[in-house]
């Protein structure tokens, strides 16, 4: 399963910019990988872990702006179609328990 987080946060005031940085750093600390600007994705192994991650994001949501989350299966994620650009694969993103580099 994958959790995809989309967000559009204001960056007008210094407080807005700080909230944006803090939320982005929170996602990265939780293991999310950037797919695009303001679109982050995390691989989770089961529904229990997914529920925990979703509730953690809800607790750390910014004060203002738009934050959306969706959970998709690995099969659905694999069917993603790239219309322009290329898939970046410089990050190891696997559900295998052992990754040999």
Swiss-Prot record:
Catalytic class of the enzyme: hydrolase
UniProt keywords, alphabetically: Antiviral defense, Endonuclease, Hydrolase, Magnesium, Metal-binding, Nuclease
Pfam families: CRISPR_Cas2 (PF09827)
UniProt-annotated binding residues for Mg(2+): 8
E.C. numbers: 3.1.-.-
Cofactor(s) needed: Mg(2+)
GO molecular function, one term: metal ion binding
Claim: Thylakoid is one of the keywords in the record: no
GO biological process: defense response to virus; maintenance of CRISPR repeat elements
Function: CRISPR (clustered regularly interspaced short palindromic repeat), is an adaptive immune system that provides protection against mobile genetic elements (viruses, transposable elements and conjugative plasmids). CRISPR clusters contain sequences complementary to antecedent mobile elements and target invading nucleic acids. CRISPR clusters are transcribed and processed into CRISPR RNA (crRNA). Functions as a ssRNA-specific endoribonuclease. Involved in the integration of spacer DNA into the CRISPR cassette.
Subunit structure: Homodimer, forms a heterotetramer with a Cas1 homodimer.
Family note: Belongs to the CRISPR-associated endoribonuclease Cas2 protein family.
Name listed for the protein in its UniProt record: CRISPR-associated endoribonuclease Cas2
